């Protein structure tokens, strides 16, 4: 976003698509045209908000997306598949009618819920959750659109500061939102109308599929015609726990309507800072990580916890990339978009480490360029979260 004086201003994410700095449409389209002009089948194994898949789908390419985040799968699925606005509107009315009876609810199993929502708002969401499950909204395209509208309303109806992609209750939000009731029904109806104007005109030109897949533990992820001719993806950042934090409110509301466990999910995001990070990592693997990231051994001595975050990221990404490489066709192309990171005060060239992991899986680098991120920063800057990525590296590989 550029102001009148020509200076770049941080972009506040929109209400309908605020996935944190994962991919932007102009870069997605550039990558498709540059590397996948003759694409037979395209996979984005970390699809996020689906920008890569949407760009490929517009060209009539069969696209497949994976993501561990149920919210990302829901959002991208609605984007790619489209839905019938009239059918969705009927389902929305059924949802409201069933929930408004007030005699049944599906409680949110989370101790923090009363901190984030007023009692009246919380009661309405728990009634809506019961109605959504009873109506099976997750089983149809129109139902998923209604469910996405429910999820999109959650932040708007919470006590959270609306300026940041990550929910927190600032002093300003506490003062401005205290004692006010934010009605989910009104927000859901408006949001569904906005979704219909964008995605209610039919479905993708070609086959478009989105699956919830944990690539670290995946045994046999879905394939297209024996494999994918092209993979284009922006993997999670090294300190990517924000992908969970940013959507923890929505995930708590969706849990039980969509089959997943939020308590377990927070540990499955690549880049997590939670839990026992190095329990499964052997000494041999740690030594390999020290080779991948110069300075990691020094970081381990000065800040073991930060070093553990790096170890866990490299461990998880190593397994994820191996899984990805195994489902690319022998003549396939793989494009990785990744930036640097700042962890514990240490500057890490994450993309260099991932490029090495790709070469270890039999892929050779044949092209690349840098993409400056001047308009993807999000306010406000908060203590402990100043490691904003200023530039990403695009690296294109073919099988060696």
Predicted regions and their residues:
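Alpha-helical packing segments of well-folded alpha/beta enzyme cores
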Residues: 24-27, 124, 128, 191, ...
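Short glycine-dipeptide loop
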Residues: 38, 257-261, 323, 328-333
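Core SAM-dependent methyltransferase catalytic element
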Residues: 329, 382-400
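SAM-dependent nucleic-acid methyltransferase catalytic core
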Residues: 125, 130-233, 238-247
């Amino acid at each position: 976003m550029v102001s009148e004086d020509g200076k770049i201003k941080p972009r506040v994410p929109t209400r309908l698509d605020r996935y944190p700095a994962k991919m932007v449409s102009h870069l997605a389209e550039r990558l498709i045209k540059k590397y996948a002009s003759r694409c037979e089948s395209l996979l984005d194994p970390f699809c996020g908000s689906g920008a890569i898949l949407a760009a490929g789908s517009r060209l009539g390419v069969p696209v497949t997306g994976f993501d561990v985040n149920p919210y990302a799968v829901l959002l991208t699925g609605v984007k790619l598949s489209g839905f019938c606005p009239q059918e969705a509107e009927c389902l929305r009315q059924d949802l409201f009618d069933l929930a408004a009876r007030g005699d049944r609810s599906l409680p949110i199993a989370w101790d923090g819920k009363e901190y984030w929502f007023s009692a009246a708002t919380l009661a309405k969401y728990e009634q809506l959750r019961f109605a959504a499950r009873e109506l099976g909204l997750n089983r149809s395209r129109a139902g998923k659109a209604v469910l996405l509208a429910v999820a999109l309303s959650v932040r708007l109806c919470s006590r959270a500061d609306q300026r940041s992609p990550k929910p927190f209750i600032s002093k300003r939000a506490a003062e401005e939102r205290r004692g006010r009731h934010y009605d989910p029904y009104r927000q859901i109806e408006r949001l569904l109308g906005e979704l219909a104007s964008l995605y209610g005109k039919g479905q993708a030109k070609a086959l478009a599929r989105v699956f919830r897949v944990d690539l670290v533990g995946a045994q046999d992820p879905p394939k297209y015609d024996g494999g994918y001719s092209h993979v284009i993806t922006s993997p999670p950042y090294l300190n990517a726990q924000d992908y969970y934090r940013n959507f923890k409110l929505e995930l708590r509301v969706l849990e039980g309507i969509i089959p997943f466990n939020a308590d377990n999910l927070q540990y499955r995001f690549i880049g997590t800072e939670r839990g026992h990070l190095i329990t499964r990592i052997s000494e041999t693997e740690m030594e390999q990580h020290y080779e991948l990231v110069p300075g990691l051994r020094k970081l381990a001595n000065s800040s073991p916890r930060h070093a553990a975050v790096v170890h866990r990221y490299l461990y998880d990404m190593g397994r994820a990339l191996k899984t990805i490489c195994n489902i690319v066709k022998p003549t396939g192309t793989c494009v990785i978009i990744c930036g640097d990171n700042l962890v514990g005060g240490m500057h890490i060239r994450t993309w260099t480490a991932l490029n090495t992991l790709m070469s270890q899986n039999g892929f050779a680098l044949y092209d690349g360029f840098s993409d400056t991120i001047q308009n993807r920063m999000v306010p406000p800057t908060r203590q402990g979260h100043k490691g904003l990525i200023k530039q990403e590296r695009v690296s294109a590989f073919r099988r060696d």
